[in-house]
Curated annotation (Swiss-Prot):
GO terms for molecular function: lyase activity. Belongs to the D-glutamate cyclase family. Its EC number is 4.2.1.-. Pfam families: D-Glu_cyclase. This is Putative hydro-lyase ACIAD2519. The keyword Lyase applies. Keywords: Lyase. It is an enzyme of class 4 (lyase). It comes from Acinetobacter baylyi (strain ATCC 33305 / BD413 / ADP1).
Amino acid sequence: MNTSILAPPESLLEAQKVRLAIREGYDRPTAGMANGLTQVNMISVPQDWAYDFLLYTQRNPQSCPVLDVIDAGQFQSRLIQDKQHDIRTDFPRYRIWEYGQCVDEVNDATSIWNNHPDLVTFLIGCSFSFESALLNAGIEVRHITDQRNVPMYLSNIPCASAGRISGNMVVSMRPIPAAQVSQAVQITAKMPRVHGAPVHIGDPKSLGIADLSKPDFGDFPRILDGEIPVFWACGVTPQAAVMRSKVPFAISHAPGYMLITDVPDQAWML
């Protein structure tokens, strides 16, 4: 890989330690871990569905920004230098999908993967990767403060279909003080490879979200007086497409349980 985009040695060591802890059974959301390093979503689909999925990601770059594609039979990413890493073990939690239904959650997907050797894997940018920039600007990230998972919602925003794949956008939400919303927009707009600027600010009902306290994925948020809900496109969108399109088989990360890479967040800053 291009070592010029790697994080400094001390950060690489931290990433390696986190991946090892996950491999050995750590099972919690990864927001705030290995601060400053890129985290990624994952979706793995059978080879005969891979082109449709690739086209789907290209038509929906804000919600599905592809950072790497891993061929069938391969289990390592160009985003990680450490040769011990394995995408089958280095996410804290995986979801197993059959015909659009989540049938299981596991912490190690190796044996399941062995039964499906034709899976092609897409690593998708994650909004966790702009959170260090928000924190550095003095903007609180509430789910990190509260040590909870980020709230995510299935919106009414349709994605552009591709072949057999269709679905609506999933959005993540962060409550931001009104006086800091414009700054949060400016910061995240500079990072389009990890979802970029918000897709909506304010009234959740405009997105088809009836109750913010009941996210479709993640934990319910704590919103304080004077804060505005701000919504970003989310890399869980491919899972919504799996559900809608009834893909025969797929493996994904569990929402909020990401892979830590060796690439610094700043690598995606324009």
